[in-house]
Amino acid sequence: MSKIVFCDFDGTITAVETFAGMLKEFAPDLSAQIMPQMYARTLSLRRGVRQLLESIPSQKYADIIAYAENKPIRPGLAEFLAFLQEQSIPFIIISGGIQGMIETVLKREGLLDKVTAIYGVNLHTQGEYLQVHSDWENETELVAKALIMDKYSGVETIAIGDSVTDITMARKADLVFARDRLIDYLQAENQPYIPWDNFFEIREYLLLRD
């Protein structure tokens, strides 16, 4: 059966929480108030992330993109993407973070053209404050990951993630690689997963399994 890989970005491809870190940098007080509620799942990602982003002045957009420029990625991503290309397995990034930040990091690494598609949040900067736009918004998420996965039917789905934004993606996938907070959420729901630390490990697992 053909496969497809869906991967989070913030804290998954990046070795640090790039989007969450940016929010703490540019909206520190509101982040301290809202982020614990999102992690506890008492406030929806849709409401919380929108509220945080739309509290930031539009003139800060260039600084936001620059914030991502030096953020490190997890080891093995280039090798993992090369492996997927050899196997003709699409690699799709689905992120609740900002599209421009994702593209900035991938361009720096020379990997943007190795990614099949990127789904993230776009920001409009015409007004005084940032305005959020997402084509994949639902009742609880700004970027509804399971909804995007539905576009790609008839294949084995592999999910890679690390946190609260990846729960619906993990529930939907046939095979899940989880780390950090996502492990706790999946354990609480008795959902199966494979722990991972770097992309070399994921490549090795898929090689041995096949």
Swiss-Prot record:
Its EC number is 3.1.3.87. The keyword Hydrolase applies. GO terms for cellular component: cytoplasm. It catalyses: 2-hydroxy-5-methylsulfanyl-3-oxopent-1-enyl phosphate + H2O = 1,2-dihydroxy-5-(methylsulfanyl)pent-1-en-3-one + phosphate. GO terms for biological process: L-methionine salvage from methylthioadenosine; L-serine biosynthetic process. Pathway: Amino-acid biosynthesis; L-methionine biosynthesis via salvage pathway; L-methionine from S-methyl-5-thio-alpha-D-ribose 1-phosphate: step 4/6. GO terms for molecular function: 2-hydroxy-3-keto-5-methylthiopentenyl-1-phosphate phosphatase activity; L-phosphoserine phosphatase activity; magnesium ion binding. Keywords: Amino-acid biosynthesis, Hydrolase, Methionine biosynthesis. Pfam families: HAD. Dephosphorylates 2-hydroxy-3-keto-5-methylthiopentenyl-1-phosphate (HK-MTPenyl-1-P) yielding 1,2-dihydroxy-3-keto-5-methylthiopentene (DHK-MTPene). Belongs to the HAD-like hydrolase superfamily. MtnX family. This is 2-hydroxy-3-keto-5-methylthiopentenyl-1-phosphate phosphatase.
